[in-house]
A protein has these predicted regions:
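The feature marks the mature, well-folded catalytic cores of soluble enzymes
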Residues: 1-153
Length: 153
C-alpha cells in the first residue's frame, strides 16, 4: 500500500496567509455593512482555483483593470505586490486599497527604489511577465534588466 506524506511546512506561505487574513477581514466588514461598494482583488489573490472560487462565493470579485473599480469599492493588492504607479493611480482615482503585499516582497520594493534613486542599475532574475517581477520593476520606473537566470545576467 502506498503512503502519502504531508510535508511539515505545507500550505500557504507567510505572505499568502497575510493576504488571506486581510481579505477575510474585508469580507467581514462587508458582511457587517461597514464598507460600501464591492470588494475586489487585483488579479486572483493566489494561484489556487479552490480559494478563488470560495472567495467569489463570498462576493469577492477579481479586477484586471482599474476602470472596473470605483471610489466606493475596496481593492486588495495580492501578496505579489504592484508597481508604485499602480498605487499612485488608484490613489488618484480615490480607490480604497488594502495592500496585502508580502512584507518580504515589500522589502525588495524598498531596496530597488532606494538603489535606483542612488543611480544603480537594477537587475532582476526572474520571469519578466510574472506579476511579482513586474511589481518589483515598477519601483525603478520599469528600467530594470530582467533576465531568466544568473548566467544570462
Amino acid at each position: 500500500m502506498k503512503e502519502i506524506l504531508l510535508a511539515e511546512n505545507s500550505g500557504f506561505c507567510f505572505g499568502v496567509k497575510q493576504a488571506m487574513e486581510k481579505t477575510e477581514k474585508e469580507i467581514e466588514k462587508k458582511q457587517r455593512n461597514e464598507s460600501a461598494g464591492a470588494l475586489y482583488t487585483w488579479g486572483p489573490l493566489i494561484h489556487n482555483q479552490t480559494v478563488t472560487d470560495a472567495l467569489r462565493a463570498q462576493g469577492v470579485r477579481i479586477a484586471e483593470n482599474l476602470d472596473e473599480v470605483t471610489a466606493e469599492d475596496t481593492l486588495i493588492v495580492r501578496s505579489h505586490g504592484e508597481a508604485r504607479a499602480f498605487f499612485e493611480e488608484a490613489d488618484r482615482r480615490g480607490i480604497h486599497v488594502v495592500d496585502a503585499t508580502c512584507p518580504f516582497v515589500k522589502k525588495i520594493h524598498d531596496l530597488v527604489e532606494e538603489a535606483y534613486g542612488k543611480g544603480y542599475r537594477i537587475i532582476i532574475l526572474g520571469d519578466a511577465q510574472h506579476p511579482e517581477v513586474r511589481g518589483i520593476n515598477g519601483w525603478c520606473e520599469n528600467s530594470a534588466l530582467v533576465v531568466p537566470t544568473a548566467e544570462a545576467a
